[in-house]
């Protein structure tokens, strides 16, 4: 296959992708439709957010659609740092995919965890069914359409009925090459009453010093059948030259539950969309999002909840801190339809600004079509509290140390709610290193022993923002 840039991603290139992978005609047609929509759709579909859409400097045009093969030394170095015996892991290192060793006991239960290409080849009819009933349609989002057209990596996970898996399923992506694009699509099927955890980790081993812009595009769908319970934790610590486009969406059947948690810490420009659709009665969703921007980083995040069935519940909280010249835009919408009687929803968006050149905006929204529901939302953007700063400095701390403690205290009530301990530890570590101006891949993976002891002791935190809301 010839090496192409994103501006050359045309119908011929899509045909080349499909032909090289021996894909069925319906998937090729789906890719072509998606590519056509990408060229036509605006960056922002909602009139509420159109004026905030800002893609200046994204530089997608020069992105190469050819991922290099990593060297053996690079592969071994990554594996030595990221290998874990406490998870079932797929590694995506540049263009190289390393599949997991699934324990025999789980394999006999019918669990499937493999890369998306292998899954499509083995069971094309299954994928035809889900692609024709996709959660994230090409027409829903410009960059979702681009992913649907160009994806070449990703994972497929199926957990059968009534199976509870204690080991997490882990997907680790490492993107180091300059000017390259990696497009991953993930499909998760949680059958009736299944329960499991997914860890999605994005890293660059060289966090600074690169100039050529790279692109990471990830699209994840979680289909929850009756009574299914899924935890999906993700962390983004990609390099300062990577543009990140992330779309995640779940469809929840009766009494299902999903818990999202995201640490958005890396990248040059990050555009993140998380949506939970509670389609049937009793479905529930929780979404926790932590953002820390420094330098010239830009973050544009969305947390949406669509409650269609009665007696559903949704809870989404996002917190972000920006320093230097960083920018943060946090958006979210609660939609409760006319049939969603007795439903409950809460949406909170809070930003903290450090410095005169940083900027943050929070835009929560409500669309409610019925009575007998409870929907609350809160939003705040502020500088560091001068009284808190003065108090800490009067106790002997420097201004820098005092601000660091205030930031830790701002984030911790939310980080403490991240359901996967290893992810929570890594988020804390990266926040601390970013505050100190240290950008070292190996250091990000290590947690000082005293921090482990402190949090394992179960110190309680209180979120002072939880009481501030608008009520309906």
Regions found by a protein language model. Give the residues of each.
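N-terminal amphipathic, basic helical "cap/leader" segment at the start of enzyme domains
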Residues: 1-140, 144-145, 295, 323, ...
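Conserved beta-strand/loop scaffold segments within soluble protein domains that form the structured core
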Residues: 20, 105, 109-390, 394-397, ...
